[in-house]
């Protein structure tokens, strides 16, 4: 039975592979692949071949959460997206997951994106920055167009987290708190290998 293989870890078993759940992405007919984290195991001929053997104790007390905030929006930057999108979203969403160009490029046609992003964060809303290149991770400090955002404490850096993992984590976090410091603390806390 699979749950006893890695008792303190959530995983998905498909096509002979055991993958860490927060790192799963749908890629093709084979359904899922693990992004930025190794496969946990494969199963061949009813045999388990383990690749990842770190044992983590199960928490003593299970804590359940009943509150999620579904006001989280994924914004994939494309050349035609205008900064006004932030104004359109502000009445409907509490957080934006910003999928940047490359590993951290944000448009710099003028200062409208900079103003929109800082205005969003300064209004108490949340922005998590990620990439459209999942196997590379996100690093705002690499390109000039991302550097001005890299040191702002209100802009969450997703590093190598998958977009799907960021959505789930932010929905959970924002269901628990609206305090920026607590949001950041929970976001940067590793849960089930969602951050490597």
Question: Model-found features: residue ranges?
Answer:
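A structural signal for short, well-ordered beta-strand segments and their strand-loop junctions
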Residues: 9-14, 129
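Accessory alpha-helical/coil subdomains and C-terminal extensions
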Residues: 11, 20-103, 108-109, 191-196
């Amino acid at each position: 039975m699979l749950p006893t293989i890695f008792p303190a870890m959530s995983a998905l078993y498909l096509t002979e592979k055991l993958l860490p759940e927060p790192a799963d992405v749908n890629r093709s007919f084979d359904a899922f692949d693990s992004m930025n984290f190794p496969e946990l195991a494969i199963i061949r001929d009813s045999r388990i071949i383990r690749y990842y053997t770190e044992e983590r104790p199960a928490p003593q007390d299970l804590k359940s959460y009943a509150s999620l905030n579904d006001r989280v929006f994924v914004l994939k930057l494309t050349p035609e997206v205008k900064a006004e999108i932030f104004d359109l979203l502000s009445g409907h969403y509490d957080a934006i997951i910003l999928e940047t160009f490359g590993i951290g490029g944000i448009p710099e046609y003028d200062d409208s994106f900079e103003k929109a992003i800082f205005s969003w964060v300064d209004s108490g809303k949340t922005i998590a920055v990620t990439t459209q290149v999942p196997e590379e991770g996100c690093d705002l400090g690499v390109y000039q167009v991302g550097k001005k955002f890299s040191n702002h404490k209100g802009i969450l850096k997703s590093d190598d987290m998958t977009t799907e993992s960021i959505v789930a984590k932010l929905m959970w976090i924002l269901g628990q708190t609206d305090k920026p410091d607590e949001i950041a603390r929970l976001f940067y806390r590793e849960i089930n290998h969602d951050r490597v």
